[in-house]
Regions:
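Conserved alpha-helical positions within TPR/SEL1-like repeat arrays
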Residues: 13-17, 41-52, 75-86, 108-119, ...
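Terminal, low-structured helical/coil segments at or just beyond the last alpha-helical repeat
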Residues: 2-12, 175-208
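Conserved structural position within tetratricopeptide repeats
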Residues: 31-34, 64-68, 98-102, 132-135, ...
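Short coil turns that delineate tetratricopeptide repeat
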Residues: 37, 71, 104-105, 138, ...
Length: 208
């Protein structure tokens, strides 16, 4: 670590990105913080690395500090919300997703907040979030993104008992990305909707 003493902040960030291990990268970001205690990006990056290591408890204080240092960065609030979400702090997570959306609307923040609304059975709020996310320009070009949003909204529609709309969203999501990692959710959801609507499985999936 002695060689890092002569590096400036920019060089240290570049070195952290080239680090061979997450632990090594964290050590470099800590060096940045020593040089610049107000560097919110370094705090956020350490939080992300701990999150990637499956250690949300260690990530939490870094995300909190990042939002304190730069309260106008929506990504920091979204990252903080995700950690709180993983720890089961639903109210705090929703609050921070809301701050993130107010600053920098993104499909992930909307989808994650919608998931929590579904958990709380606030289905109309979940539907509104997914619909808003699907209308965002540019960010939803990836099929996986849209597929997950349709799945979350379908979950909300099923919660409301609106199986016709749920079936539409399930079929749409599965058509967008048939190899999605949540394919089991689509299959179970479609079967449930078919049973509730009294239609054949083939008809429900739009078979010819």
């Amino acid at each position: 670590m002695l060689r890092y003493r002569s590096m400036n902040i920019k060089e240290l960030f570049q070195e952290a990105q080239r680090a061979e291990t997450l632990t090594h990268a964290i050590g470099i970001y800590e060096k940045i913080i020593q040089q610049d205690p107000q560097n919110s990006e370094a705090y956020n990056n350490i939080g992300e690395l701990y999150g990637n290591m499956g250690q949300p408890g260690r990530a939490l204080p870094y995300f909190v500090k990042a939002t304190e240092l730069n309260p106008m960065n929506g990504v920091y609030y979204s990252n903080l919300a995700l950690v709180l979400h993983c720890q089961g702090h639903v109210e705090e997570a929703i609050s921070n997703y809301s701050k993130s959306i107010a600053l920098q609307p993104s499909w992930s923040a909307y989808n994650n907040r919608a998931t929590l609304y579904n958990y709380r059975k606030e289905y109309d709020n979940a539907i509104a979030d997914c619909t808003a996310a699907l209308k965002l320009n540019g960010q939803n070009d990836e099929v996986c993104t849209k597929a997950h949003l349709y799945a979350t909204r379908a979950d909300a529609y099923m919660g409301k008992g609106d199986y016709k709309k749920a079936l539409h969203d399930l079929n749409t999501g599965m058509a967008l990305n048939p190899s999605d990692d949540i394919i089991g959710f689509y299959d179970k959801g479609i079967l449930r909707c078919n049973l509730k609507l009294g239609i054949s499985p083939c008809e429900g999936k739009g078979c010819k």
